[in-house]
């Protein structure tokens, strides 16, 4: 959906929720393929199932339905005798077209500079946010997406400089700042990964999509799959790989894994390699596509393994690694003076796992209307990119994120905890390419996590 249409919906949200007669809209929404029948059933079950709750969820989900979603919704209102609301939205669209400057973009990037990360001299950067402002040395930049993508109660745990690192590499050597061996021995400071194998790892790799989906072949993804299959076996996981699953089969595979008995194991990992998109959410943003072109929200995937869905994983770390686009924006970054040689230009073999909305509405996004995990714990969801932005994949070497994650795990998993490893991944990936990419994560782990490497 265009930013102007999205803003208009949000400005009119209170009135729409108050006056919208949703019961009369279902057939019209189906006939115009704005939503599938399953999606409408999810909307009807939102909250208490009241008209207001349904209207509220409908307006929220409408933002994910493509560039033509709002004009089609307006025509649905006209066909169901809700002309007053249709006129309200139509006049708002016309006003925005006549005066585009009146609509302040919500996707304006906000550069946020975090403190020193203990980088080596070669990795140090000088970040210049504004030509009129003095440069700031030895800082690591993070480009955050739209503020509204991160609910106030759920600020993502991305690159937190205040978190103690188990190994300080500031001068190129290891210093006993926070010795991993000492932390590993304390159950109140680090998760216990004593079992061997330490847990299951499910890798879902979607490469070939049906022609009707409009989604391209994800050349290079098999390289990502093979790297992570090898890496997590090395980390003492029992790895299972599923290739080219439809959305329904993805959910089935995840639920089958959740129904297993994990009581004798200490950890659990899910890796999903696919195309992705934005999706309405309460906690975890984004969605991934099955090979049939239907999507499954990350929130739904995570909630399959919550306390009620998988009690045998209660209190144990559950890790989700998502290699997929969070949207269609390409991040050009901002000016940096960098001494690192890690950057590389974007060539013809690099392509995004993005799904543009320019083809009109798709009956795709399946949304989890009601979250069953209000206070998530022992969960970490690592995204290859921030919501709203593309995630780059090289046809010859695989995705930037997975290639870097594999290398960091190989080099540092013996000595550093997971959060420190992900900081390294974010720093390395952000240095790549003409277009920029910055991984991030939602971290609800209660302790440090050190992988089992021997």
From Swiss-Prot:
Coiled coil: none annotated. It comes from the Eukaryota. One of its GO terms (molecular function) is SH3 domain binding. It catalyses: Strict requirement for an Asp residue at position P1 and with a marked preference for His at position P2. It has a preferred cleavage sequence of Leu-Gly-His-Asp-|-Xaa. The keyword Chloroplast does not apply. Inhibited by BIRC6; following inhibition of BIRC6-caspase binding by DIABLO/SMAC, BIRC6 is subjected to caspase cleavage, leading to an increase in active caspases. Cleavages at Asp-353 by granzyme B and at Asp-368 by caspase-3 generate the two active subunits. Caspase-8 and -10 can also be involved in these processing events. Phosphorylated at Thr-163 by MAPK1/ERK2. Phosphorylation at Thr-163 is sufficient to block caspase-9 processing and subsequent caspase-3 activation. Phosphorylation on Tyr-191 by ABL1/c-Abl; occurs in the response of cells to DNA damage. Belongs to the peptidase C14A family. Involved in the activation cascade of caspases responsible for apoptosis execution. Binding of caspase-9 to Apaf-1 leads to activation of the protease which then cleaves and activates effector caspases caspase-3 (CASP3) or caspase-7 (CASP7). Promotes DNA damage-induced apoptosis in a ABL1/c-Abl-dependent manner. Proteolytically cleaves poly(ADP-ribose) polymerase (PARP). Cleaves BIRC6 following inhibition of BIRC6-caspase binding by DIABLO/SMAC. This is Caspase-9. It comes from Mus musculus (Mouse). The gene is Casp9.
